[in-house]
Amino acid sequence: MNIHEFQQWVKDYYQQRKWSDLDIFVRIGFLAEETGEVARAIRALEIGRDRPDEVEGTYREHLVKLTEELGDVLGNLLVIANKYDISFEDIL
């Protein structure tokens, strides 16, 4: 899937669930939340979490989690771009 196809998929997916109707400031909050989750995933990969209430995962598990979180950040960026009719290809 190329970036244009992914941007259209995100647009359709969010519209079906009425998530694209949310206020832009709510969306910015979601983006900030997902960015924090990327930071958490990188911390787990690089220095570990060192929390007694969490099971330590493998490097591969942490890498999968980071990949998912980066996808969530990209999805949120695409929703914002879609709101303002900005093509991700134009951004790149």
Task: Outline where the language-model segments fall.
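Flexible "arm" and connector segments at domain edges
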Residues: M1-L70, L74-L92
